[in-house]
Design a protein with these regions (language model features):
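Charged, amphipathic alpha-helical regulatory modules used
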Residues: 2-113
Length: 113
């Protein structure tokens, strides 16, 4: 028989992969917006809450959309992610901003009236 394989040195386990959705120390970077400051702040706060609460981009987008539908009347659309393109039609109100590595595009399209 050949020599025994060498045992690997034991040390602390490697750190877990970064969960880029978590909102720790995220600063909002506004790219474009037609919203009032108050509405923009609501979008950022809803996004931070969604990033803390959920683990997928779709869940975060759903959280933001539902908050805006309930607060500012339907119909809002939301896209959340690190890499996407868009070409949209909107009704006067939209915002596009980053929280850390995550981009958020939120816009109103249509109404419930």
């Amino acid at each position: 028989m050949g020599p025994k394989p060498k045992a690997k040195a034991k040390g602390p386990p490697p750190p877990p992969p970064e969960n880029y959705l978590k909102s720790e120390n995220k600063v909002a970077v506004l790219k474009e917006s037609t919203m009032s400051k108050a509405m923009q702040d609501s979008a950022i706060n809803a996004a931070l809450e969604g990033l803390d609460k959920y683990n997928t981009e779709s869940e975060v987008a759903g959280h933001i959309k539902q908050f805006f539908d309930n607060t500012y009347k339907p119909f809002w659309q939301c896209t959340v992610g690190r890499n996407f393109g868009s070409f949209i039609s909107y009704d006067d109100l939209y915002t596009y901003f980053y929280l850390g590595k995550v981009a958020i595009l939120l816009y109103k399209n249509g109404s419930a009236d």
